[in-house]
Design a protein with these regions (language model features):
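Terminal presequence/propeptide segments associated with secretion/organelle targeting
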Residues: 2-4, 8, 15-583
Length: 583
């Protein structure tokens, strides 16, 4: 059966799988290669990652600091998710040229659209530096030395296993990345927030960009003289397709996982943090959605903001559901009990878990206060930029922005534990008479502020409050859900787990560094008697199509195509019916 497969290395996490798990470091993938071959992999470890020759790593990019992309041509053509390119698409959209709604396709290189502050990074190499740092070398020195090796080089030192290992990552950064194409939102965001993070899915979640470089193929700032980047390696697009049982692999930059955290932390996430953060974001989304429904200019203005808020909002809902359904807290507590039984006979680990749990009891309340502050007051602008002020929609935004200020102040006052509220906030509310009145006062000061006026319209208490919040949200000890002491204990805990649980295949948590995941293509059983196949088709889109609901209103051309069944070489026959694969 024919399948359409854009690339197995896409950042879309389609329904793969067997019971395989893991996000493996590519430089160490040789240790997994036998298992990969047993599942159908036919290449070598060097085909995946190599410093000395072109390999797959040279075609996988970190897109704009938070997404994965893949190079699919010898002239720098790049695929990434639609939602990853959403901000760039929005930046070029207007009521007259509504690329968000109608899509965009450059018909020549001259029509490709440059994007301010958009960049991609390609991994040059990664190397373990644990011993070098233990011997006294400083991470900053390693970074400086690596960045001096080439044009546009960027580097970082990242911890694995809570500091048991440390790796240096060296990237080549390209800052001239141009928009080539994107489908209409009715394709690229089909299903909207309802279908996000779930399977089955019918979303054409892709956008197309091109990397440009200097004539000598080096990173360069935007210039009309730049030329398409010539990659060391690019992926070809296969139209042969896949079937259940085939080997499949994901190569990309997963954001963050916490595989080894204690049951106390999971309990906090499931029963306290996620419910409150979901509720707060629901209120913000309701305000923004109401504004978008009244004005096409506001719909475009708030499109990326709405999408950014909704992405984690929907993820947390699934996280809460999944962790509850799998009884993750109870499972972890049983695992910890068995570890403790082993640790009791080993002085190095005997009191480890009790100390970790005591540290959690000490720091979870202030961390909760930090999370609430970040989700409320931390979402508000410290200033409106000149670029925002010059936008046609700026004055149109005023009622919505003021409503968001009021909502943030009220949610903060309601949910942040009193002992951790910013003192200047309490003083300001008391002086103004209510949270709404104080929110209005702060909003008016920020709304009218310009570069020349600076903060002249903000009284001292308001400036202190904003400064305090900026400090709080920028403090590493508060941002990190593990205190310095707890992080040290986790370092020992992971060491102990690896000594005790010798049958477990350990892999480092995701931290936005390049990883490999692999398995075999399969569907899954969502509930008793409810099996979802790993492939969706156009029939599913038509079944969901509803012109009355924005997220499910497909283009008329797609309805016409379905009616005619004129699918050309992309058509397949499933159960005697002609259709076309989607995801």
């Amino acid at each position: 059966m024919k399948r359409i497969l854009l690339t197995l290395l896409t950042s879309l996490f389609v329904a793969t799988a067997s019971a395989d798990e893991g996000m493996w470091l590519p430089s160490l993938i040789g240790g997994r290669i036998d298992d990969m071959r047993s599942k159908g992999f036919r290449l070598t470890a060097e085909d995946i990652y190599s410093v000395n020759k072109a390999s797959m790593k040279d075609a996988v990019v970190l897109f704009n600091g938070g997404c994965t992309g893949e190079i699919v041509s010898s002239e720098g053509l790049l695929l990434t998710n639609h939602h990853c390119g959403y901000g760039a698409i929005q930046s070029h959209s207007s009521v007259e040229h509504d690329y968000l709604t109608h899509g965009f396709w450059a018909r020549s290189r001259a029509e490709e659209l440059p994007n301010k502050n958009l960049f991609v990074r390609i991994l040059v190499r990664m190397e373990e530096v644990t011993d070098r740092i233990a011997a006294g070398e400083k991470p900053e020195e390693l970074i400086r030395a690596a960045e001096s090796e080439g044009t546009g080089y960027k580097a970082s030192v990242e911890q694995m296993y809570y500091g048991n290992q440390q790796f240096l990552f060296v990237y080549e950064q390209f800052d001239d990345v141009r928009l080539v194409g994107a489908p209409p939102s009715s394709i690229g965001k089909f299903g909207g927030d309802t279908d996000n993070w779930i399977w089955p899915r019918h979303t054409g979640d892709f956008s197309v960009f091109r990397i440009y470089a200097s004539p000598d193929n080096k990173p360069a700032a935007y210039s009309p003289d730049n030329v398409p980047y010539r990659p060391r390696r690019h992926f070809t697009v296969s139209t042969r397709g896949v079937k259940e049982g085939d080997f499949t692999m994901i190569y990309g930059f997963p954001g963050n996982t916490q595989e080894y955290i204690l049951s106390d932390a999971v309990d906090y996430v499931v029963n306290r943090a996620d419910p409150d953060k979901i509720a707060i974001r629901t209120g913000r989304l309701d305000l923004i959605s109401a504004a978008q429904a009244t004005d096409p200019a506001l719909r475009i203005h708030y499109a990326a903001k709405h999408a950014n808020i909704a992405n984690a909002w929907k993820k947390w809902q699934g996280e809460q559901l999944g962790l509850t359904r799998t009884r993750n807290v109870a499972v972890k507590r049983d695992y910890e009990r068995r570890f403790q039984a082993w640790a009791d006979a080993r002085p190095e680990y005997t009191g480890l878990l009790p100390m970790m749990k005591a540290e959690y009891a000490r720091m979870l309340e202030p961390y909760y206060a930090y999370e609430i502050t970040r989700e409320t007051l931390g979402t508000l602008p410290i200033r409106y930029s000149d670029e925002e002020r010059s936008a046609d929609s700026f004055e149109r935004c005023r009622p919505t922005e003021q409503a968001l200020f009021r909502y943030a102040f009220a949610a903060y006052a309601e949910r942040c534990p009193e002992a951790y509220r910013v003192p200047e906030f309490l003083d300001g509310v008391a002086a103004a008479g209510s949270t709404d009145a104080y929110a209005d006062k702060v909003f008016e000061g920020l709304w009218h502020r310009t570069d020349t006026m600076a903060v002249a319209r903000l009284d001292k208490a308001m400036k202190r409050m904003l400064g305090h919040i900026s400090w709080m949200l920028g403090t590493t000890s508060l941002r990190n859900p593990t205190s310095k002491r707890l992080n040290e204990l986790y370092t020992l805990y992971i060491k102990g787990l690896r000594e005790w649980d010798t049958q477990r295949a350990f892999y480092p948590d995701a931290n936005l560094t390049l990883r490999v995941a692999y398995g075999t293509v399969a569907g899954y059983e969502y509930a008793d008697g409810e099996y979802h196949t790993p492939q969706t088709t156009l029939d599913g889109i038509i079944a969901k199509d509803n012109p009355e609901i924005y997220d499910y209103d497909i283009p008329q051309a797609l309805r016409d195509l379905y009616a005619s069944k004129d699918y050309g070489r992309w058509g397949v026959t499933i159960d005697g019916q002609r259709t076309v694969p989607v995801c």
